[in-house]
Amino acid sequence: MDQKEVIGETGHKSVDLIKIMDKWQKKWTEAKIFEAEHDSRDKFFITAAFPYLNGVLHAGHLRTFTIPETIARYQRMKNKNVLWTFGFHVTGTPILGLANQIKERKEDIIWAYNNLHNIPMDELLKLNTPEAIVECFSKKATEAFKRMGFSLDWRRNFKTDDKVFSKFIEWQFYKLKEMGHITKGSHPVRYCPKCENPVEDHDLLHGEESTTVEYSLIKFTSKFDGKEIIMPMATLRPETVFGVTNAWVNPNEIYVMAEVHDEIQKLDSEDVDLKYNGIWIIGKECADKLKEQDRKIEILKEIKGSELLGLKIKNPVTKKEVPLLPADFVEMGIGTGCVMSVPAHAPYDYVALRDLGKVEEVGLIPLIEIEGYDKYPAKEIVEKLGIKDQNDEELLEQATSKIYKDEFHKGKLNENCGEYTGISVKDIKEKLTKDYINSNIAEIMYEFSEQKVVCRCGEKCIIKTVKGQWFINYSDENWKKLAHECIDNMNFAPEGIRQEFHNKVDWMKDKACARKRGLGTILPFDENWIIESLSDSTIYMAYYTIARFINEGLTPEQLIPELFDYVYLGNGNAEEIAKNSKIQAETIEEMRKEFLYYYPLDWRCSAKDLIPNHLTFMIFNHVALFGREHWPRGIEINGYVTIEGKKLSKSKGPVLPVSEVAENFGADVARFYITTCAELPQDADVKFKEMEKARDNLIKLYDLAVSVMEEESAEKELSLIDKWLLHKTYSSINSAETAYEEFQLRKIGLMFYELINDLRWYKRRGGENNSVLKEVVEIWTKLLSPVTPHLCEEIWEKLGYAGFISQEMYPVSKPELINEDLELGEEFIKSAMEDIRNIKGVAKINPEKMYLYTADDWKYDLLEFMNENAEKNVKALIPMVMKEDKFKRHGKEVMKLINEIMKIGVKKAIAEVEILENAKTFIESEFDCKVIVNGEDVKGKKKFAIPYKPAIYME
């Protein structure tokens, strides 16, 4: 096979990637080379958030899991003792719900799992119990991991419904309760009425990222139908009550008059007392919601919205009466169906009043002073943007967003706000809400941040105040301080997400940690409850460290709390625990050593959807249960995955099962593409044409390896182009190391594609040193092996090496072969040739003779001067340059040259004449003409030459 053909435009399709994949996976399994135990080497412990087994592993899993897999392989090459393993998440209600849906033969579910998850119909219809689903998808997940060539220690694998794992979770919850972190009480939670359970993100079909939003209900009052009534107005900005000029109701909707009682929970009991809270007029949907939020609602009558128009209601803060006016934009699914109007500051309100011709009648009341705005910000921005009416929704959204942002960051309450005058908008909400509640002019109502929040069972979720519920008190300020301390000392990839974790900790509230149904561990101190799935998955990384011992045959009964106290906290005596647990003391000591060796966790890897829940909970639980020396050290976050621009969906598609990708493209192609197609925080869009290109380029490396082994590798004196290729290759060792260390895996892909281009250039420049090519292939096979291990194992074997490349050390760079001048020289030649092509194209000539002129010496001196002062901008640089006599005499030409050099980039000066002379034969062959370097100055062209840009004349 001719190497020149191999590194040309197309690679051979002579290699069977699937066959290679099968071969090396079998060899790895037989050799057990990825099983890890404590020894004298430095350790490296990396994990990813384990998958939930209600479907096959898909492209999103592939990206999230291949990143730590790649880093694990790299760290082994750095002689680290790497622990990299996986468990499976099965607890909670989704699997239970799926089993019921299959049992009921739900058409959409049957279609999805048959067509998207590729489950044969006869097998699918048997998945009508949680146990069958767990067995099916745990096997498929295991097979998918193995088909992708993941270098896992399978001895540590577990499922979260394992009885032995439940003993670990029981220990965790006993500890949290002892510390006062678990309490019982009433709290608003996301709730499924059909399942009769609080629901978490994993339980949802829609609205996984929804949060619970706290609205203030401002209690306006009036008389209606002969009764004193309250008309509560829901708002996220209670300070705006000072600027209310009217209120909006929807004339086309149904409202209710209802008698409201507050439910007051009795001490140490789930029973309640009722406290009368007046007669309210609210939307019908609002009444249904408030029934679930510590209120008893008795409907007295229904009222059409149109019947309320013109009613005067009293502002409880300003004591002014304002009218109810009609507005079709009032959404009954949010708040109470009655909305405060603040037209001085809300563009929607101002435009709606203007459309009704009511602006002058009700007036405008300013309440916030904002730098850069006049007295009435909404009026000003509406007129500035030319908003015609309420149909200009896009402009209204733009106006509203800008004003609210500016008010929050720069606004202060004005003299219309009484005792609150001068307080900034960003600081007022909490104080004002507290004052209003204490004065009985406001209450709290909870809504979702998204309107569509649906349980996996298909039921629409609500916010319910659950009584007698167990909570983890993540709102504890002292606990939050420890979490912040942990975050401050962690590594993050990308670094920019650190602040997001701080924000999540600040916003964290108490969280329901148990439910009445589903799979999982029974709450050890209240057997009526089951620990929910985001609470039993916060410290299981510690379980990995001892799972191999447990999986050798320990029983749940042997895993007594004292065992975990000793292993994880160092409390107690191994001999005493051995007597009580019937576990050998030596095994207990080994478990303790293994934990101390591998902990803390070096890196936790996940997609960004787990930041507000699992990952933040992980930090909280670690700082509560473990000493600082065992707090997690790093978190890596990647973006989502789409398929040809379409969002992944387990129920609607696309899914792209991992096993399908492995069989169609080969594991290495999938691994290479998914880790290198996007920067870490960006979403990755899988495009099959690009995967095919990746496959072709990987095959080129294989074919090159075969070709260099077929040809003689006689020692030759190194040419300049040989030295250039070696420089590029040995420079790549350092660059790749940095990329791996910083999780910048896209750079590995870009470097590989650059290698392919470099090999083409090497061939084009006459490179033919087989020894050099073999050296390049050996190094790059190592550099790529963490990403494409099967192909690299095969190449390593073809190169004549015994053993696994998976156990080789990372290549060592050779500083003596790194010479930046070589790289700058070749880039200079490429640039000059591009300029020649452009001139030929514009002039439309085929020259017989071509003159290349390099710059005058003073121009190189200027380049060096700029290089020495590279931190200076042009404005600062010019006075410094003009102080030098050798530059000053060239006057305006200097100014122009500085700008031109800045455009091409300030680089060190190189021997351009020598470089062009050495490349002259090559350039002549490329353009089929005679090349003269710095010959006679034909038509005065030489003066146009600048460093890195030779002047060109053709004839």
From Swiss-Prot:
Protein name in UniProt: Leucine--tRNA ligase
Pfam families xref list: Anticodon_1, tRNA-synt_1, tRNA-synt_1g
SUPFAM superfamilies from the UniProt entry: Anticodon-binding domain of a subclass of class I aminoacyl-tRNA synthetases, Nucleotidylyl transferase, ValRS/IleRS/LeuRS editing domain
Keywords of this entry: Aminoacyl-tRNA synthetase, ATP-binding, Cytoplasm, Ligase, Nucleotide-binding, Protein biosynthesis
Primary site of residence: cytoplasm
GO cellular component, one term: cytoplasm
Listed EC numbers: 6.1.1.4
Leading EC class: ligase
Location of the motif 'KMSKS' region: 647-651
